[in-house]
Amino acid sequence: GHGEDALSESFTAALEKEGVAQESLNLTTVSQIPEDAGCLFFNVPVSDLSEGEAAVLTSYLEQGGRMVLISGITSAQMPNLDRVLSAYGVAAAQGMIVESDSNGAIPSYPNFLLPQIRSHAITDPFLQENGLLLLPNAHAIVHLDEVRSTVSIEDLLVTSEASYLKTDTSTLSYQEGDLTGPLSVGVAITEDTAQ
């Protein structure tokens, strides 16, 4: 509904192997997320949610719903999606991350990141397989200063201290003012709704 990329056949097959059923859901046509929805998955949206969609999504999350958001570099303004994310203490820092640590990127491609994978219930199966994760042309996820005490944010994927965020990509060299690493490129956010 927002120009998302289609899920790859291999990803869809992996979901099916794990017994996960998937179906599309148009948030503009529902007043609430179906109760049997275990998780909403947004795959690189290129346009914003409407205010109504953001309200439906927020209500779902406030009731303990789950969401996976894979986002990409975009010039599109997304104030409604940004509002949902900021309610959970994060924001997308637009720009492209450049990694100058040779262990953190593909050789000769400093924008093709090989982030450090931190131990977490989400990432541990991947770590046990000694997996590598390639993130081409990634942006950073910043932790906001103000977040509810019930919200916990854990970094899952981070770049090295030698990385930096380029908002002006006319040069990939570091320039004064570039946000420096380590930078988050994957986070897990949970909220204790029992409080």
Describe the predicted segments one by one.
Residues 4-195:
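Acidic, S/T/G-rich, low-cysteine, solvent-exposed domains in lumenal/extracellular/periplasmic regions
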Residues 1:
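An acidic-aromatic substrate-binding cleft motif
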